[in-house]
Amino acid sequence: VIFGNHFYRTDERYPYFGSDTRSAEMLDLYAESAIRGMETGLYAYLAHPDLFMRSYGRFDGHCARISREICRRASRLHMPLEYNVSMIAYNEAHGVAGVPHPDFWRIAADEGCTAIVGIDAHDHRVLESGLYYDRAVRELAALGIPVIDTIPFFEY
């Protein structure tokens, strides 16, 4: 099972992290729920761990702090983080650094994280081209982040 940290606890009471993370409080909620989810042991990896950057605007000190918390915990739990390439075309077309966010991934490298490259299936064209996948592998290698290419399964 893949952990997509989209909402704090429930979508019925809390806003979507990808479009509504505009305050330090929302960043803290994101980090708290990401860490709690990883600690359950139910998930193979954390999808788009930098999702909050779709709406936060700029990578400030608070982003760096929560990113370090998330990455440190993922590393200690041996949980891969997904380097999600689905938004790269959008980022480039609009001149933004959203997901994947370079500053987040520098922290992930510093914390000794492992990555898996992911491609959301929202647009079939992303799946049909290896362009973004190959680029992601090169970028992660340049950061010194090990990349896995299979989803780890639970061993009971």
Feature roles, as predicted:
Residues 1-77:
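Extended substrate/RNA-proximal surfaces in nucleic-acid metabolism proteins
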